[in-house]
Amino acid sequence: MATPPKRICIDVPASPSGNKCKVKRISIEGNIAAGKSTFVNILKKANEEWDVVPEPIARWCNIQSCKDEFEELTTSQKSGGNLLQMMYEKPERWSFTFQSYACLSRIRAQLKALGGKLKEAENPVLFFERSVYSDRYIFASNLYEAECMNETEWTVYQDWHDWMNSQFGADLELDGIIYLRAIPEKCLNRVYTRGREEEQGIPMEYLEKLHYKHETWLHHRTLRTDFEYLQEIPILTLDVNEDFRDNKQKQESLIEKVKEFLSTL
């Protein structure tokens, strides 16, 4: 495995007051339908010095749901392929392709966001909806263990992931992780509620395996990775079994916990 690149601090230009502030990079992690998309939208509205990078779902599904800087059509989208649906329908054929493209599109979106609106912020925070680490150690590894990737594909994926991180990883290295913790049963209910067509056939067993991996990595902290700094990275765990989409009091409580967490970084 490649050695992780040395940590490099990314500075934004000096603010009007003359202060130069480093952008804090926080990843929001959690199972499918744990509430990440809802949560990052709440975060974006909570503080003008906070910005978010949502998962580039439209890139994976060929759905131009909204016009923003993360959702422009690419050549692969124009080809008409719904890669997410293809992966769910035939994982043993498309897992390697999907995981490679999912990570690539995530890196592209996150790098682009670093040059965004936070340049003038005093205390800028950029929240990523998932990271390149969960791409590899949660989702891709789970597909390999389920024999949806063969040994050769898994070896190639890891080599590719190592190289991509050697080139761009320092710019995406995290200052902290927020783990949205929800039991698989809640996640499955939310899958049905949000009605994303590609996900309607997801079995409980799949969510249970992903939950176990998230718990091992972020709760018990026993999952070993090739990135040493992750072993000591600060983690805030938020219980999101209770629905918070329309619960203002719950939202405010979560935001306060995030603010307290950020103050320690």
Swiss-Prot record:
It is found in: Nucleus. It catalyses: 2'-deoxycytidine + a ribonucleoside 5'-triphosphate = dCMP + a ribonucleoside 5'-diphosphate + H(+); 2'-deoxyguanosine + ATP = dGMP + ADP + H(+); 2'-deoxyadenosine + ATP = dAMP + ADP + H(+). Its main location: nucleus. Signal peptide: none annotated. Keywords: ATP-binding, Kinase, Nucleotide-binding, Nucleus, Transferase. Its EC number is 2.7.1.74, 2.7.1.76, 2.7.1.113. The active site is at E129 (proton acceptor). GO terms for biological process: deoxyribonucleoside monophosphate biosynthetic process. Pfam families: dNK. It comes from the Eukaryota. ATP binds at residues 30-38, 190-194, 242-244. Substrate binds at E55, Y88, Q99, R130, D135, E199. One of its GO terms (cellular component) is cytoplasm. Disulfide bonds: none annotated. One of its GO terms (molecular function) is deoxyguanosine kinase activity. Homodimer. Belongs to the DCK/DGK family. Phosphorylates the deoxyribonucleosides deoxyadenosine, deoxycytidine and deoxyguanosine with highest activity against deoxycytidine followed by deadenosine and deoxyguanosine. Shows only very minor activity against deoxyuridine and deoxythymidine. This is Deoxycytidine kinase 1. It comes from Xenopus laevis. The lineage of its organism: Eukaryota, Metazoa, Chordata, Craniata, Vertebrata.
